[in-house]
Amino acid sequence: MRVLVAETGREDNVSVHSREVSVNGSDSGTGNDAYKLETDDEHPPATPVRGLSTRSQKRPFRPLTIQQDEDVENDTGMNTEYNDDNSSLVNTPRDSTTYAETNSPNTEKLAGRDDDRSLLNLIDRGEIDSKRQRHYVPVHCKRMPKKEITLNQKLYVSQVIGPADAPKSKTIFGKRIMQWEPSQFKESVWASEISKSGKYLATAGKDAIIRVWKVIETPERRETLLKEGPQSCGRFFTPSSIFEPEPVLECVGHNAEVLSISWSKNDFLLTSSADRTVRLWHPKSTKSLAVFRHNEIVTCVAFHPIDDRYFVSGSLDCKIQLWSILRHKILHWTELEYVVSTICFYPDGESIVVGMFYGLCAIYETKNLQYVSSWLIHHSPSRNKKCRVTGLQCASIIPNDSKSDNVVLVSTNDNAIRLYNTVTHALVLKLSDAHRVNGRVLSRLSEDNSYIISGSDTNEVVLWHIPNKVLINASRKRSVILHLPTETFKVCSERLTSTIIAPARTAVEAKESEHDRSLIAEGYNLVKPHSHRSYGTPPVHPIDIIIATNMAGMTIVLCVDYDLGNSHHGFRNSKFGHFVKRLLRT
């Protein structure tokens, strides 16, 4: 291409027609997750010439014209058309192309972003050797104490499981972009859960198929998978991968999207679906063990944490029902004021917490579903009208202490995370505005209450650190925590649908498959250690494995390498850190 600049003294209004980005589709499905670039030729929005201010456009300037050889397209991949006065340029796309969701809400910057450098795109293009190198994910820290262990330079991609078909690459506007077709979003994951034993991971979503992935059991099995090569190891497999590359079970039976998953303490699995049924599964059986039919779409389901012969379900007909699995019938049911969106049990199973539309949370006794209490998320009725509770998780303030007060982590669609005391209904913690939390991604507490994990509107995983005794002190003093130490990182360009901090049992199972069982020390410390510099501790930490799923149906497994950079935050800037640098130079 040759660019010619012509000298002129007349005031021509040279404008480059901007590309419009329109979002096609509704909130459900793939409409919000595939952007379409179109050019309006009839009414192009004129924008100022690049490099010229509003004042400078009144003065004479040299208009920019582009001369192009015949049958040659410009660098932008667009066909070039000229107006009659040859003063303005119209870029018309050769075809309408669909792309993955952008990182920023400002989708007009899609053409200028280097999307082809995202993690999953590098894997699809084979730029990461899974056997020779670890791909460490950049982690951004905020408000981190100096002595706090961070994930920076420690978090790496262990495994990617999901659809076998890779996205197609295409050069648009001078950028190489990995292209996802709408048909490739048929396997979007809506729910994911790790079993209580830590051996299984279940994912389900749009295609109505429940996939169960098993932790690799023995070192011999791991070596066999590495020798077989990438053809049998799925999308991305490394020597430190956690799960089998292929699901050990694919449960087929639902006729519509699966909305919720719940594991029992004995590795039984319940799934609720838009086909108005709840089905019971087990990893060793390909067929559903039982089907529980409802009158409306079942939005949520939860196993009893102590006695897995019972479970509760919530549906769009504003009802919650307590079921007996052995009797295959409803023991108790009650009709609520609003539509039920999510439900969870107390750790002891004595009560349940129900999340509803219009920002309402309520507590009921499990035994007979008697009403106990309720509270609203907002004080303003107009704000509650738009608020919907999307996720609940109940936990004890002091882990494994039956006498401790309970707190419930509430996820809503107003981009905030809240933690309430279930007795006083007092707000203990509220996290919002900083990272624009995506309310569709269920926020979760780690099993030792050391972390809260969620996803943001910019497709980042957000991890909040909860210092020791902060929740206890805040609950006693009735104070509200608004800020916590935060770490954020990005693993994909598609919208996240769920994030999980794997329990310590999953890390133990993975360690046993990497090494001999005799190397695993007894008495694992499952709570956050008070001292981070303890060299005799077993190889299990408060956070070892993070799992994220996205709209493309992929499950990304990340591990933390605590052996690399075994120092606390701020080590490089400390006096001892400078001393070590000088010592290494000599």
From Swiss-Prot:
Q: What top-level branch of life does the organism fall under? A: Eukaryota
Could you tell me what this protein is called?
Uncharacterized WD repeat-containing protein C18H10.05
Q: Which InterPro entries match?
A: G-protein_beta_WD-40_rep, WD40/YVTN_repeat-like_dom_sf, WD40_repeat_dom_sf, WD40_rpt, WDR44/Dgr2
Instruction: Describe where the WD repeats fall, as residue ranges on this chain.
Output: 184-223, 253-291, 293-333, 335-374, 387-430, 432-474
UniProt keyword terms in alphabetical order = Cytoplasm, Nucleus, Repeat, WD repeat
Q: What species is given as this protein's source?
A: Schizosaccharomyces pombe (strain 972 / ATCC 24843)
**Presence of the UniProt keyword Mitochondrion in the record:** no
**Region feature (Disordered):** 1-115
An example GO biological process term is:
vesicle-mediated transport
Q: Which Pfam families match?
A: WD40
Basic and acidic residues compositional bias: what residue ranges? 8-20, 35-44
One Gene Ontology CC term in the entry: cell tip
Q: Where in the cell is it found?
A: Cytoplasm; Nucleus
Could you tell me where the Polar residues compositional bias lies? 21-31, 76-107
